[in-house]
Curated annotation (Swiss-Prot):
Belongs to the RNase Y family. Residues 207-270 form the KH domain. Endoribonuclease that initiates mRNA decay. This is Ribonuclease Y. It holds the Pfam family KH_1. It is a single-pass membrane protein. The lineage of its organism: Bacteria, Pseudomonadati, Elusimicrobiota, Endomicrobiia, Endomicrobiales. The chain crosses the membrane at residues 1-21.
């Protein structure tokens, strides 16, 4: 029992002691928590103060930066406004000056207007006086002559009618003479062939081509029924086709070398093909003309290679090709051009000048002769215009214009080289025949005079210049106007050209209508 009591007392005391110890421990924990809380609060305050300071510092930096940017923008804006004010001030000053000038001009105009008004009034008075004088003179003339104005008009018209009758009489005489020539057509044909044969000794090498045929039966097929084939051929090619009694040969005559070559090739193809009629003739001639364009291009390219001058301009190359069929005083113009090119290059090399410039100028110096029968002007000017068109220098143009004396003074040593080389090529023995050139010039001028008339599309000088065949545009010239056109052309030829004998004017107006049957 005593042990139990001791145990109970011990347990009680132990519980009391444990309770007291828990109280003491709790108090100690509370103090520790309070201290920890105070320490945490102090640390948080310190962190908050540091963060606040950083935020304030950043804010100050941002404000400072924004302030500087704002001040910079304000400064730029003020500068812009200042510049605008300066410009406005300048414009105001300019406007003031212009207004002053306008005021002066208005003042001058008003003064001129007053002056013109006074002069106009004076002129009106003068015109009135002149009209009065004219009326007085008319009355005086009527009184002296004893005729009225209507009577004078009748006399004038009567004189004009008399002149017209005289012109009609001359025309009638020409028509009668032409009828007599047609009546003796065969003899005239033989005479023209004889003239061609005589001229051939002097010009056959440049104005005629002969085609050999296997037999004379082909001549009849070439002539065609009532000569329609030969007429169609001459019409399409612009040459004279001479079919005479010379065995197994046909002669083509034309002063234009390209026409003559086209006619020769076309006739050879027609003979080889065997089909010879107007439609086929027109078809073959058209094809040969197209082939001739390619041939001229190839000839020009070969000439450029032989000359040793680089050239890629297709038009220049074609014009050089045309020079192959152009002669000057009987001398081949392409051969002359190449000779001048080679001579100019050699001379320039010896003198230490620009060799390529001299060779190119020599190549172009006579290129206008390829089109001088189509374009107005001397061949010097035409050549210079072509060079200028394709961007050549003033020095080059001067060298071209000055290669003959009397046109332009040479402005460079190279220009003298071109003139010298041209003179050497032209002056060599046997190079030229002056009478041939005079004959060709006359035919070219004859064609040129005819082409000046309105409505003329093509003109061919034929029969050694004794006939001009003219093709007109049917839209511009009607049937009634063809007679007037022929009369006007004849008058102009009589006034401007010198020629032996007579020239027959033939105007052809042709209208074609095509339709396709489907």
């Amino acid at each position: 029992m005593g042990n139990i009591t001791v145990i109970v007392i011990t347990a009680f005391v132990a519980s009391i002691v444990g309770y007291i110890l828990r109280l003491i421990y709790a108090k100690l924990n509370i103090r520790s928590v309070e201290q920890t809380s105070k320490r945490v609060i102090e640390e948080m305050k310190l962190i908050a103060e540091t963060k606040a300071k950083e935020i304030i510092l950043d804010a100050r930096l941002i404000v400072d930066r924004e302030r500087k940017e704002f001040e910079h923008k304000i400064k730029e804006r003020r500068q812009f406004i200042q510049n605008m004010e300066n410009k406005l001030n300048q414009r105001e000053e300019s406007l003031d000056r212009k207004m002053d000038a306008v005021d002066k001009k208005e003042k001058n105009l008003s003064e001129r207007e007053k002056d013109f008004s006074s002069k106009e009034h004076l002129l009106s008075v003068k015109f009135s006086e002149v009209d009065k004088v004219k009326e007085e003179q008319k009355k005086f003339l009527e009184r002296i002559s004893g005729m009225t104005r209507e009577e004078a008009k009748k006399i004038l018209i009567s004189g004009m009618e008399e002149d017209a009758k005289q012109c009609a009489a001359v025309l009638l005489q020409k028509l009668e003479q032409e009828m007599r020539e047609n009546a003796d057509k065969k003899s005239k044909e033989i005479l023209s062939i004889a003239i061609q044969r005589v001229a051939a000794d002097h010009t056959a090498d440049i104005t005629t081509s002969t085609i050999q045929i296997s037999n004379d039966e082909i001549k009849g097929r070439i002539i065609g029924r009532e000569g329609r084939n030969i007429k169609a051929f001459e019409h399409a090619t612009g040459v004279d086709l001479i079919v005479d009694d010379t065995p197994e040969s046909i002669t083509i005559s034309a002063f234009d070398g390209i026409r003559r070559q086209i006619a020769k090739i076309a006739l050879e193809r027609l003979i080889a093909d065997g089909r010879i009629h107007p439609a086929r003739i027109e078809e073959v001639v058209k094809k040969v003309k197209k082939d001739m364009e390619q041939h001229l291009k190839e000839t020009g390219e070969q000439a450029v290679i032989e000359a040793g001058v680089p050239c890629s301009n297709l038009e220049i190359i074609k014009l050089l090709g045309k020079l192959k069929y152009r002669t000057s005083y009987g001398q081949s113009q392409l051969q002359h051009t190449l000779e001048v090119t080679w001579l100019a290059g050699a001379i320039a090399g010896e003198l230490g000048l620009d060799v390529m410039f001299c060779k190119k100028a020599a190549l172009l110096h006579d290129i206008g002769k390829a089109v001088d029968h189509e374009v107005e002007g001397t061949h010097h000017q035409i050549s210079a215009n072509i060079a200028k068109k394709y961007g050549e220098s003033h020095k080059m143009i001067n060298a071209i214009l000055s290669h003959h004396e009397g046109f332009e003074v040479p402005s460079s040593p190279e220009a003298f080289v071109i003139a010298t080389a041209d003179a050497i090529s032209a002056a060599r023995p046997g190079a030229r025949k002056e009478s041939v050139e005079r004959y060709l010039k006359r035919l070219e001028k004859l064609e040129k005079v005819v082409k000046e008339f309105r409505g003329v599309s093509i003109a061919y000088a034929m029969q050694a210049g004794r006939e001009v065949r003219i093709l007109v545009e049917p839209e511009k010239i009607n049937d009634n106007q063809t007679q007037i056109l022929a009369h006007d052309i004849a008058k102009k030829i009589e006034q401007e050209l010198e020629y032996p004998g007579q020239i027959k004017i033939t105007v052809v107006r042709e209208t074609r209508v095509q339709e396709i049957a489907k």
